[in-house]
């Protein structure tokens, strides 16, 4: 009898001990047994929060029955996530540069990272507080945008291409070239990407020029073509591209491969092409802005994003390729080979071209958009903000140079 009672007590103790982990796993949908709960539980019940500023549609939010990554982080760590979106690298940069808000995590692309490093806008995380950094394939580390790998942790990689409707564009040869975006055969059925970096990069590639501007003269050549394009396009788009392409409202649009995967899943008539002239290959990274006062919390968030289960959820939800070796091992062969090496052979990275040329491109992009009154009201506030940010950046660079000379 005593042995039976003792056995029941031991069994009850085991249930009680396992209950918190089991309950937490049920709430978050994540296998907490694979997590270092001592590491993630350091700030539980402190009432802390972090502010994350990410591009739209760029995280698994549980909308399609997958893992809600931010909710899982909150429940595992006790740290509240204040999450907001931006539409382009440039709008994110302008908001941070003008002091519009303070964020603890941002997710810029490679060329923007190098710009933000040069202008002192990022702080160095303590990489020893991000043990999952070991999961990142070394070929994505120590790249030209962050050669010492002190400021950024790779999140995704991808490529810019053309998403098109096969019912409207029946000949694949049409979208084998960026020239499709100037085709009068698709008048009012062409969407153009609404950011200066990609718009000029596409045009440079079509002209057979380097995708990174090397002179004002190169920019001017692209401006001529971009102004000519206005007569055939339906609209300039950012996240609006999803509704328009999924809804069959346009024949084609330049956009990113991961987002193309999402759109194709909702409309099987859509397909994706990487034009033969080449395109932009990019890496987006998790970074900590200089103004953040919550570095250790941000490091924990970054580490959580590198957990295999979290990384897999993000990859499946957003469709972008992963630099995380542990996640890559879990993917099927079709996903691993998309995009294929042959298509990427002529692609390259954007680089930071300096404050003077960057400001010149921004001004010329505004000139392209405002050449049509239809877009003037929309773009002028954005342009003025970009100009203010650009002038501030230029003055900082000049002041730094002067100080060095002294």
Segments predicted by a language model, with ranges:
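Mature extracytoplasmic/periplasmic domains
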Residues: 280, 284, 289-347, 387, ...
């Amino acid at each position: 009898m005593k042995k039976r009672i003792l056995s029941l007590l031991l069994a009850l103790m085991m249930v009680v001990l396992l209950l918190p982990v089991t309950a937490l796993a049920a709430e978050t949908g994540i296998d907490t047994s694979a997590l270092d709960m001592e590491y993630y539980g350091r700030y539980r019940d402190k009432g802390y929060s972090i502010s994350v500023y990410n591009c739209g549609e760029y995280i698994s939010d549980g909308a399609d029955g997958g893992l809600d990554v931010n909710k899982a982080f909150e429940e595992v760590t006790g740290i509240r996530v204040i999450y907001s979106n931006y539409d382009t690298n440039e709008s994110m940069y302008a908001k941070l540069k003008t002091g519009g808000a303070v964020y603890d995590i941002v997710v810029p692309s490679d060329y923007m990272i190098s710009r933000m490093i040069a202008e002192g806008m990022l702080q160095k995380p303590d990489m020893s507080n991000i043990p999952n950094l070991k999961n990142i394939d070394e070929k994505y580390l120590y790249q030209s945008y962050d050669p010492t790998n002190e400021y950024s942790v790779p999140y995704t990689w991808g490529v810019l291409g053309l998403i098109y409707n096969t019912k409207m564009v029946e000949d694949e040869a049409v979208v084998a070239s960026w020239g499709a975006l100037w085709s009068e055969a698709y008048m009012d059925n062409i969407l153009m990407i609404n950011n200066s970096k990609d718009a000029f990069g596409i045009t440079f590639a079509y002209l057979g020029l380097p995708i990174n501007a090397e002179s004002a003269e190169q920019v001017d050549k692209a401006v001529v073509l971009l102004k000519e394009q206005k007569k055939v396009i339906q609209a300039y788009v950012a996240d609006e591209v999803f509704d328009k392409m999924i809804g069959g409202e346009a024949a084609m649009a330049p956009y990113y491969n991961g987002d193309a995967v999402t759109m194709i899943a909702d409309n099987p008539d859509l397909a994706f092409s990487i034009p033969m002239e080449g395109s932009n290959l990019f890496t987006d990274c998790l970074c900590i802005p200089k103004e953040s006062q919550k570095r250790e919390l941000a490091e924990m968030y970054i580490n959580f994003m590198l957990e295999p289960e979290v990384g897999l959820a993000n990859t499946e939800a957003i469709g972008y390729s992963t630099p995380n070796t542990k996640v890559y091992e879990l993917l099927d062969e079709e996903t691993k080979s998309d995009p294929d090496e042959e298509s990427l052979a002529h692609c390259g990275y954007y680089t930071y071209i300096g404050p003077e040329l960057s400001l010149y491109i921004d001004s010329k992009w505004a000139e392209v958009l405002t050449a049509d009154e239809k877009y003037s009201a929309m773009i002028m506030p954005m342009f003025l903000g970009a100009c203010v940010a650009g002038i501030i950046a230029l003055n900082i660079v000049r002041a730094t140079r002067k100080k060095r000379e002294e």
